Amino acid sequence: MSEALQLRAAEVQAKLALLRACLGKAGAAAIRLRGIDWFAWITAGGSSAVLQCAETGVAEVLVTQDEAVILTDEIEAARLREEEVQGGLNLGFSFHVSPWAQIELRERYVLGLAGEAVVLSDRPHNGEQPLPHALRLRRLVLGEAEQMRYRALGREAAEAMSEVLRAARPDWTEYQLAGAGAHALWRRGIHPALVMAAGERRLPLYRHPVPTHEPIGKRAMLVFCARRHGLYANLTRFVSFGAAPQEQSALLEVEATGLGAVEAGKSLSAVYHAFDAAYKHADRAEALNEHHQGGITGYLAREIVATPSTATGLEAGMAFAFNPSFAGIKIEDTFLLGAQGLDNLTYDPQWPAANVHGRQRPLWLEVT
C-alpha cells in the first residue's frame, strides 16, 4: 500500500470508528449516508456526485459495527472503485452493486443487515432516524489530512479567481466572466459548485446576482464556491476599470471586527453580534438584514450560518467563510481556525491587498 493510501486509510478508519461509537451510544444497527457531503467525508475525499447541483449522489455508504459498504449500481460501480474509492478494501469498504433497474435490491440488502433495528441517516427515509447532533458537529472539526486538502484547494481556487479577473474586460458579459471562472476551476480539477458574476449596473441591486447577458462595464464581482474532495473554498473578488469605490475601507473595518471575534471557546452567535456592532458603528445597521454574514464552512458551502442565537461553539480545526457586504460591495475568504488564530486558505499573495489590523485583506483590482 502506498503512503498516500495508508494515510487515507487511517483517516477513513478513524471516521468509521467514530460512526461505530455513535451506533453504540444510539443503540442503532446502521448509519446510512446518502449526501455527497457525507460521502466525501467518510471516504476521505471521494465523490459520489454526477449531477453537480444535487445533494445526493450515485452512491451511499452503509456502516454497521462489522461492515462499511458502498451501495451503488452497475452504471457507477467500476468508476467508483477505480477513481473515487481506490483500494476500497484497503480503505475498509466493500461494495454492494445492484442492477440500475432493480433499486429495491439495495433496500432488501440494507434490511438484511439492519433488520428491524434503528437506522440513522443524514437524510432519513422510511422510518430512519436523523444523525445525532453531536456527530454533525464533529464533522465540522477537520483533521490534519482534511486541512492539507483544504489548503491546496484554497490556494488553487484563489489562483483561478485572480487569473480570470486579470483577463476580464469591460465588454465581457456576466456570462463570459462566470464561464471563464468555471473554466479556470475545472482546469484545476475543482468543481464550480457556485459561480456568480455581476457587472456595474446589477452589482448594487442584488446580493445574489446570478449572471446574465449584460456587459460588465466599469466594474464587476466574481464569486466562487469551489468544491474538491467534498470541501468548499468560498471567495469573492472585484475588478474595477478605473478607481475602486471608497466604501471598501469601511467594509474592511466591519469584516475585521467580525473576524476578530472568531476564537476557540466562543460561540458563532458572538461573531454575529460582533458584525452587528460593526455595521452600526459604520452607520450601516440595515446591511445586516440585507444578507447573511456567512459562518462555518467545510463539506457544505455553509455548514452553519451565524445568527443571533447560534450557540455552536467554535473550535480549532473549524473552517469559516464570512461575507460582510454593503450594496454593491462584499468581502469573502475561507479561513481555518488554528492555534495561532485564523489562517486565510484563499489568500493569493499576487492579488492587491491591504494590511487591516495585522491581516492581509483583498482590495479591488484596479485596471487603468
What name fits each language-model region?
Residues 1-368:
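Active-site neighborhoods and metal-handling regions in enzymes and metal-associated proteins
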